[in-house]
Structures are given as structure tokens and as C-alpha cells.
Amino acid sequence: MTAEHYSLVGDIGGTNARFALVKQGSIEPEAIEVLPCRDYENLDQAVVTYLERVGVASVRQACLAVASPLRGTRVTMTNNHWRFDIEAVRQVFGWSAFKVINDFTAMALGVPHVSDANLVHVCGGPGDPGRPKLVMGPGTGLGVSGLVPIRNGWVPLVTEGGHVDFAPTDDTEMDVLRLLRARFGRVSVERILCGQGLLNLYQAHAEIRGVAAPLDAPEKITAAAVDASDALAGEVLQHFCEMLGRTAGNSALTLGSLGGVYLCGGMLPGFLDFFLGSPFREAFVAKGRMRPLMEFTPVYVVTEPYTGLLGAAEALGNSEV
């Protein structure tokens, strides 16, 4: 590969770092590699290893999406040991430009580039493509972002919408709030609508009912719900989907996202059929007088595994980022 024709893009989470190359003027990632973060002392080592694997000595510029709040030039990863200074890394590699963006900002920027084959329609539509899009994703946490259309593209909205207060709507949810408040103090929607949150919800339901909670990991709960081997797991996952629908609907109303709601992240594709049959749809549209507006808003599950890389590639040439 000829180095001067490529830029480096990456999507770095708590566990893995995904890297790819993109040609100048393109957003299609090539030579994708996934490196375990624990195997590398720092970002520099991981980048060097990646470039060696793909046979490129250097690239002109780079954009990395990171699972971390961004303030200034110092980056401290939320769920792994990497720490780096943006300008110092740029100088080490001799890049002409180095952008670092939030991982969910990248997810949002990638959504317009996801093919129809990797979008599963959940409900609603046809929507209005000229209006904002909401991007939400339960995974390690609950990411929330938005896209506002401009003349030649999109402006991403960097938010911490997963940290808004959890608002219970019935007696069971009041009990869930009481139990989680005793554990965490303040209870955000992310305390429920993410992988660890599903486990929190399962344990709370078990305590409310006075029954055992033998499942100790979110993937065990989803597996038991899908194969109907644990009744409590099934009910809890239904409740999880319902609350996700309600929360997505609230965010859609706030943003005015008639351009669509896009559900990303690693969780939902793992139990997609269950999700499509869950109370999500009704919870999303059940907004009283606003129901017709919600029914007009299309909702999709994004199954593209490298949406963040697409977004990082988009960010390279997006002057709004």
C-alpha cells in the first residue's frame, strides 16, 4: 500500500481498538484489524503494530474515536489504561492532522453511510430525511447523539443523554428506582439501559419478588430470555426493551428527530428477533397527543459492525467536527 494515499481511522473502546485505512476522499474502511487494548502499553504501540501488519510505514493524517469524554488535548480512556496527549501523538507519527472525537459522535457520523442491508426497520415512518436524526446505543454504557442536517452534510451533537434521570412510570419501576438508589445514589437511565444495567434490572426484579437471581452476567440474561429457559430473565428483558422504547421516544421528542431513530451498539443485534417482538414499539409511540408524530418517525436497528470507523472516516473531512 502507498502511504501517501491513506489516512488512519480508529474506534477505540474499553476492550478493543479497531483500526482501518481510508483512501483520500473516501469513507470506506480498508484493512480492518481489531487489537486487544490490554496487549499494548499505550496507543502508540497499537498504532505501530497495526501499520506494520498492513504494510504501511506511515499515513498522512488520522482520526480516532475514543470511549472517553474529551476536554483539551489530554485523553484518558474511560475503561482501559491508555492515556495520551493528542498533539504529542501527532508529532510522534508526523501526521499533518490528528482528530480525536467521542466514540458515539463517530457512531452518529457513521449512520448516514450505513447501507440499507445493515438497517433493520423496527417501526414507524416514512419520516423526513431533511430533519435531525437521533442515534442511541445500549452497550457498555448508553450512548446518545444526534445529527442535524446542513447544506453539505451533518453536524453531530455531542451529548451525555445516557446520564439523564431515570423516571419511573409505575409502581414496579418505583421499586426499581428505590433499590438502585440505595446502591448508587443517583439513578440515570444508563444504570438500566446498558449491559451492566440489564444485570442491575434483573437483580432488582428478583429482590422485588423475593426470588433468587442466579444469572450473573448480561449475556446470560439475554441468552436465557431468548431460549425461554428462565422466566424472570424473559420478563426483565421485555421490561428493558420497553424502557428503551420510552427513553428513545423521549429523546426523539426532545430532538425533533423526524429523520429517524437509529439504535446502535453491541447489545441489540444479539437478541434482535426478541427485540422486534418486544414492547419497544408501543413504548416508543405511546406519547399521548404526540402519538401520530412518533408513528411518523422511523426506527432502525443498525447491524453494521464498523459504524464507528465509518464515522471516523467521515470526520476526517467534516469541518464541523
Curated annotation (Swiss-Prot):
Compartments it resides in: Cytoplasm
Chief location: cytoplasm
UniProt GO cellular component terms: cytosol
Keyword line: ATP-binding, Cytoplasm, Glycolysis, Kinase, Nucleotide-binding, Transferase
GO molecular function: ATP binding; D-glucose binding; glucokinase activity
EC number: 2.7.1.2
Name the UniProt record assigns to this protein: Glucokinase
Species of provenance: Marinobacter nauticus (strain ATCC 700491 / DSM 11845 / VT8)
